[in-house]
From Swiss-Prot:
InterPro entries assigned: AAA+_ATPase, ATPase_AAA_core, DNA_pol3_clamp-load_cplx_C, DNA_Rep/Repair_Clamp_Loader, P-loop_NTPase, Rep_factor-C_ssu_arc, Rep_factorC_C, RFC_lid
Keywords: ATP-binding, DNA replication, Nucleotide-binding
Annotated ATP binding sites: 43-50
SMART domains: AAA
Protein name: Replication factor C small subunit
Keyword Transcription: no
């Protein structure tokens, strides 16, 4: 049975969490004092919130961490009845460990309704002796102020490129293979600061038997930078038909959707040497195209319109 690398190589201690030195130092201080406040981890997907919570539990409880760490996902259980019944029942139970409390980790807490959060705040107050709540969310602004004021808020940033490279190289070494520079850069690019995504891509390309930028873009659903650069160049220079042919190839031969193409173009444009004013206009055009496609508009028509807008913007540059 194939083991999932995101689980196999999940950090086992706080020291193994990369790029969050300030947060890790605070957590280590809590561990040393054997005292833990309620916590709120805020940050985008793949920035290490869950891994940090698990590493914290391991350091606090040692080998018995699984018995003292309850993980729930609020997106699956976001109603007030769940708070009043299930979570309340879990929170009231006193654990048998020497610390006298357990951790209830609630992922995607920003998916809870305001009413459910209000009920949860009361549960936190009632059972703070037996349960420490650790919340994880993408947007702290969606967490009601009464909960924020009762937690230590820690913000997690996208993982820096150097730490993603370090982790991927560690995994590759342990699995007995190497990653060439071009493939590494491609994985860093498509991960966008998401460590979990980077590790999943690495396992996927390794399993495919081909570690190359081409395979990476194929697996992740991105167009190759070469194709995207050609598309942008043709569009900016007003070569509408040639740009459409490139889009046709991406969609028909490479199997990319309209959203895939828009995201690929956006990634290249952000790093391009297009003048700032025109770059802003192109990004606005990309945002409009993405919105319309998501709302159900025809991919082909929206991509044609996008090429036309980029051509118009390009005429101002030329």
């Amino acid at each position: 049975m194939i083991e999932i690398w995101t689980e196999k190589y999940r950090p086992k201690s706080l020291s193994e969490i990369y790029g969050e030195d300030e947060n890790i130092q605070k957590l280590k201080s809590f561990v040393e004092k054997k005292e833990l406040p309620h916590l709120l981890f805020a940050g985008s997907v793949g920035t290490g919130k869950t891994s940090t919570a698990i590493a914290l539990a391991i350091e606090l409880f040692g080998e018995s961490w699984k018995e003292n760490f309850i993980e729930m996902n609020a997106s699956n259980e976001n109603g007030i009845d769940v708070i009043r019944n299930k979570i309340k029942d879990i929170a009231r139970i006193r654990p048998s460990n020497p610390l006298g409390f357990k951790i209830l980790f609630l992922d995607e807490a920003d998916q809870l309704t305001a009413e459910a959060q209000a009920a949860l705040r009361r549960t936190m107050e009632m059972y703070s002796e037996t349960t420490r709540f650790v919340f994880a969310c993408n947007y702290s602004s969606k967490i009601i102020p009464p909960i924020q004021s009762r937690t230590v808020v820690m913000r997690f940033r996208p993982v820096q490129d150097e730490f993603i490279k370090k982790k991927l190289n560690e995994i590759a070494k342990n699995e007995g293979f190497t990653i060439d520079d071009e493939s590494m850069e491609a994985m860093v690019e498509v991960s966008g600061g998401d460590m979990r995504k980077a590790i999943n891509v690495l396992q996927a390309v390794y399993t495919s038997g081909e570690i190359s930028p081409k395979k990476i873009y194929e697996i992740i659903g991105y167009a190759s930078p070469e194709s995207v650069n050609k598309l942008i160049s043709r569009a900016i220079n007003g070569l509408f038909d040639e740009a459409r042919q490139i889009v046709d190839k991406m969609m028909i031969e490479d199997g990319l959707s309209g959203i895939d193409i828009v995201k690929s173009v956006h990634s290249i444009v952000r790093a391009s040497v297009v003048p700032p004013k025109q770059k802003i206009e192109i990004i606005k055009a990309l945002a409009d195209a993405e919105f319309r496609i998501v709302e159900g508009s025809n991919d082909r028509i929206q991509l044609d319109a996008l090429i036309a807008r980029i051509a118009d913007i390009g005429s101002k540059i030329n």
